[in-house]
Amino acid sequence: MTTPDAEDASPSPEYRSDQDDDMAAEQTTDRQSGDASPTQKPANGKPNAKDPLRPRRKKARRACFACQRAHLTCGDERPCGRCIKRGLQDHCMDGVRKKAKYLHDAPDGSLMPGVGGHYPYMNGNRPTPLPAQDTHTVSVSPQSNMYNQAQPPAAFYPPNSIPGQLPVTQDTRAFSNQQSPISPPFTQAHHASVQNAGAPSTMSQGQQGMQQFGPLFDPSDPALFNFDISSLNFGNHYGALEFGMLGHMSSGAVETPHDNNLMNNMSGSVNMYNQQVPSGYPDQNNAAAMAFGPNGLPGSEWQETQSRQGSMHVHTPNNTSGSGSHDHHPHRNDSLNGPHAFAIGQGPATHSTASPASTDASTYEGDNPLSTAAFFANANRPHAQRSPLVSRPQQENRPPTTALQSIHANGIRKRQRDTKSVYQGITKPYDYVKGYHRLYQLIDKKYSRPWVAKAQQYLQNYRPVLLQVREELNRDDLIHQEMGLQRHLMTLQEHFAEVGTPFLICRRSGEIVGINKEFTILTGWKRDVLLGHEPNLNVNLGTNRESSESDTSTQNTTPNLSAQDSEGATPSVNIIELMDARSALEFLQHFSELCYQDPRGYASQRVNMLRYQTKADVDRIHNMKNASSGDAKLDPLVKMEGGAVHQGESAMQRLGAKSGMVDCMIWWHIKRDIFDMPVLVCMSVMPVLDKGLP
């Protein structure tokens, strides 16, 4: 390097600023007076730098590296005049400009002036490979020391290799020459030294798929996120990388790889993934190659880095390796699972379009080692190396993924119901004849003579049809009918339990089979009493019979069955026992209309529900009335704009406390079985709230 002269100017000792007019930075020209001579020179003989008519040199499109550091002007020629003057002509090269954000992944060569339109990898184009770049197949013999089963010979496409003659004898546990994981420049020369090998190299199919993986986060590798950018024709490569990273984070954040015992010991793993050392290198390098991987990492870290890659190899413009995902399960249903977010465009470079259907994400949780959670949570755990050809038969033996399995895998839980008691515990049909006999007895006991005739007329509208259909069914049909009723009841109870309104479910003959807690609070009827588990001690009958009428009637009375008299089980409470006489008669009328005349209809009516009151409850209420003499003060109500409202269970329990009846509105409809026979009555009960408590 020459000694800087007085004409050089630089912020550092090596580069000094130049005061020559042709090499100095452009200055703002000051307006001179009209009588000033344009050719006038100062006393030192140098031209005036502020002269507007002085010759100007053309501004360079890109300065060289030395001039760029010195913040001086430069020329378009290489080497430039300043570097020649200072003896730096051998090192004169274009300076590196700061890339824009959208040019982050563009190679430096594509940003050279005049090269943008002719750069071979712009706009998704692919250059014609040179003769030295042609990939020739090399026969690969099966590997047997790692996998016991034999593998057919396959074609191996060798990557870029270091020039040199390979030895004839190869260690079967080691790789052949492997390309560096770091992306090479686009002008890297390709060598075909593998073609001149004296003997065919041997490697396993699993090692072949894993040797071509690059680093996980190489920013200069276009195949960073499992798709070939040059084949997408986006135009904005940086945007593609951004969306690829977002999809990578969202699609793999919950996946964790399976932990299995397929890993070999550390020494075997390191020996298996080392690159071959050519014959031109000394033998002492073998020790370093055995301890470190191709990218300079220790053997264990190199193995973990490779385990995070997929098992599908994607070609890129720089001949770097990208990782993809093989379809480990041929029966996967993409319509339910769907491809992962960055699966668009995934696949070999031969695909001209980015179709989500052409790619398949990992079916199982552990098959995606690129997941974010798996990468950070299991950074120090060994991962099993999967070979595409060897693990394929094992994975094909897995059961096919059905729609139900896919839904459960995504976290949607299924209701767990114990249906064995329904399908295995029911061995005989329900005796509706006994139920209707008891219904007739309740009607005769509850109603007066004129009302009994009306109730029997309502029953005659539909019961003959039920008896006719019953004669066409055998015992198995009736058992199946009861199973369907109990199974349907199980579903209805789950649905009504999620709604905070009182509900009631009964058979077509009136027996109660299902209630909820809200109905118990509203009416005071306990669940065990309604279902027949406890004796019914209710004395609040709500009858309209006159005291002069006889308790027993010999006209239109169905005799008791002998089996019914001997039966010791307590029957369920009938629905007409929960209503007063007028409300129960109206219910029977609506049921006769909806049973067959309007099978898909519903009914709503206002009823008086009877509260459950035993003899002790009636005596206590009577004593409280006598003691208070009407002077008892009720609890204060919560005041709102619309008046007083009822708050809590205690307010609901006081409804109908004096009269023994709760004013309600009911809405109900009929459920049918496969024989189109009415089997269940589903009823919602809503109390009619007044402004004040009764």
Swiss-Prot record:
**A GO MF label:** zinc ion binding
- Entry's SMART domains? GAL4
Q: Which UniProt keywords apply?
A: Activator, DNA-binding, Gluconeogenesis, Metal-binding, Nucleus, Transcription, Transcription regulation, Zinc
Q: Where in the cell is it found?
A: Nucleus
Report the InterPro entries cross-referenced here: ERT1_acuK_gluconeogen_tf, PAS_13, Zn2-C6_fun-type_DNA-bd_sf, Zn2Cys6_DnaBD
Q: Which residues form the signal peptide?
A: none
Domain of life of the native organism: Eukaryota
Question: Which residue ranges traverse the bilayer?
Answer: none
Which GO BP annotation is one of this protein's?
A: cellular response to starvation
Low complexity bias: start-end ranges: 205-214, 349-363
Q: Which residue stretches belong to region Disordered? A: 1-57, 175-216, 289-369, 384-420, 539-569
Q: Cross-referenced Gene3D superfamilies, in alphabetical order?
A: Zn(2)-C6 fungal-type DNA-binding domain
Extract the CDD domains matched here. Answer: GAL4 (cd00067)
Q: Which family does it belong to?
A: Belongs to the ERT1/acuK family.
Biological role stated in the UniProt entry? Transcription factor which regulates nonfermentable carbon utilization. Activator of gluconeogenetic genes.
Protein name, as recorded: Transcription activator of gluconeogenesis PTRG_06536
Q: Which organism is it from?
A: Pyrenophora tritici-repentis (strain Pt-1C-BFP) (Wheat tan spot fungus)
